[in-house]
């Protein structure tokens, strides 16, 4: 069992959703990004998605794009991404990488799976890879013993939901809004319906469903935690680092934000 699956099972046993935080490796630099993810874990994140900075992020909103651009400008490498993964694992959380498929192909699919596992990573989220085109990754992740997380969206047909959930391991990522990432004043009404539709597919397998895109405060985290197995937050963490005058302040604000979200998932009515 991967650390990811163990963390999700532990949260379920506590009667709550897991808190999943996203943060791009190398923003504003590698050493600072390690401090930030450590603060996220200290604040209550069960799982950290380490973003693999990429120059053409089709799903990312302006805040995460800005963070990724700065990480690339700072010279962040794939090895740096794996160093951040190791830091997350050492801090006691489950570590995932979230990456578009091109950088993984460029690295080498089998090599990335092996190196991610060696760094203490539990798996990979691939927002632009569909199961039908994922055979090399399915084989590589099986060989490395790590999880693979695919995405479903409100536009997904029932057939697409079934295929995606069957191919996913660890959890399936329910993107609750059409379009790019970012905080929203209200969590999309489509999120609950998407989880209901996905749950109909995963009922037998028990595959957890984690919801992302648009969660910006503890109350929204509680709302989503009332029906999802995990609550995914990224933009809010990046925004706090962008706004902070220095890394010490950024880490404190990130830790406080994680604590607010963690309190939210624990307060949810389930």
Swiss-Prot record:
Keyword rRNA-binding in record: no
One Pfam family of this chain: Trp_syntA
EC number(s) recorded for this UniProt protein: 4.2.1.20
Keywords: Amino-acid biosynthesis, Aromatic amino acid biosynthesis, Lyase, Tryptophan biosynthesis
GO molecular function: tryptophan synthase activity
Pathway: Amino-acid biosynthesis; L-tryptophan biosynthesis; L-tryptophan from chorismate: step 5/5
Entry keyword annotation includes Membrane: no
Active-site residue list: 49, 60
Catalytic activity line of the entry: (1S,2R)-1-C-(indol-3-yl)glycerol 3-phosphate + L-serine = D-glyceraldehyde 3-phosphate + L-tryptophan + H2O
Gene Ontology cellular component annotations, sorted alphabetically: cytosol
Similarity field: Belongs to the TrpA family.
Job description of the protein: The alpha subunit is responsible for the aldol cleavage of indoleglycerol phosphate to indole and glyceraldehyde 3-phosphate.
Subunit text: Tetramer of two alpha and two beta chains.
Name of this protein: Tryptophan synthase alpha chain
Organism whose genome encodes this protein: Thermobifida fusca (strain YX)
